[in-house]
Amino acid sequence: MSIARRTTLSKFLIEQQRETNNLPADLRLLIEVVARACKAISYNVSKGALGDALGTAGSENVQGEVQKKLDILSNEILLDANEWGGNLAAMASEEMETFFPIPANYPRGEYLLVFDPLDGSSNIDVNVSIGTIFSVLRCPHGKQATEESFLQPGTEQVAAGYAVYGPQSVFVLTTGNGVNCFTLDREVGSWVLTQSNMQIPADTREYAINASNARHWYEPVQRYVSELNAGKEGPRGDNFNMRWIASMVADVHRILNRGGIFMYPADKRTPDRPGKLRLMYEANPMSFIVEQAGGAATTGTQRIMEVQPTGLHQRVPVFLGSKNEVERVTAYHNEGK
């Protein structure tokens, strides 16, 4: 692909704005700012030990998880990049207990930005792919945000995306009109369109789950996974392979490219906490992307994007990816009701 014929993220968004007339200028600018922040995070991740950013920060986030230095740095990069542009009323991050209103000395906009600044950060020190996940909502109260402003079901998202920082850095985006992937060209510093209208195959022979928790799963998940593991001799009559990176962005990106089902179910260890993944920061944006690519995403009993949030850090079980497999494991859950 010659440099002259490349489509950068900025060009892509401008063309989409002209062609569809459903991408407001403020939203386009917001997405570009988020993408620039992801580029800065990618740069810091790539420095590794040379940048003195590896290791823990000696603190915990609101989830009770030990924060890595890069967790904190990535969070600061996203806040600093987005607070002054006039596109947002407020932001919320997995790393912060409460939401972040845009300071009074900056202009405010009509959007809300929700993000997991560095997903899969347990993999930082071992050089495995990690990433950033984000979601954009309209602020229902104009430019004055409260915590209630964020508590909208995923169906209200106007944009969602993620970046993967791996062998290449990629930026995957949907604004409700399909899913497109951009690769960071480090020589010119631009996100360049490399995959258009990505589609997840409806059928798959790959699944992603942390099998070390099998003894804690509820019966529908145990049944589903045992059938996959039984292979060609079992009830499915086919052989399946397990893939698990322990980095949601990396697992979902693989599924987006070649199919599969990603599962992070609730389990018996914490019956009062339905799942581990956060609805607002992880499940909703990934569900929007997966559905736009022809896949499906449920909690096992309900479409994820129809869940009414009750708190910024609410957790849900997650089953997403190839449509036929998600429908099967969801049916197993509903049989047990």
From Swiss-Prot:
Presence of keyword Magnesium: yes
Residues noted as binding Mg(2+) 2 in the record, renumbered to the chain: D116, D119, E282
Annotated Pfam families: FBPase, FBPase_C
Pathway involvement of the protein, from the record: Carbohydrate biosynthesis; gluconeogenesis
CDD domains: FBPase
Annotated Mg(2+) 1 binding sites: E94, D116, L118
A GO MF label: fructose 1,6-bisphosphate 1-phosphatase activity
Signal peptide: none
Main location: cytoplasm
Entries under Gene3D superfamilies matching the protein: 3.40.190.80, Fructose-1,6-Bisphosphatase, subunit A, domain 1
A cellular component annotation (GO) from this entry: cytosol
Cofactor binding note of this UniProt entry: Binds 2 magnesium ions per subunit.
Cofactor(s) it depends on: Mg(2+)
PANTHER family given in the database record: FRUCTOSE-1,6-BISPHOSPHATASE-RELATED, SEDOHEPTULOSE-1,7-BISPHOSPHATASE, CHLOROPLASTIC
Annotated family: Belongs to the FBPase class 1 family.
Name recorded for this polypeptide: Fructose-1,6-bisphosphatase class 1
Organism listed in the record: Burkholderia vietnamiensis (strain G4 / LMG 22486) (Burkholderia cepacia (strain R1808))
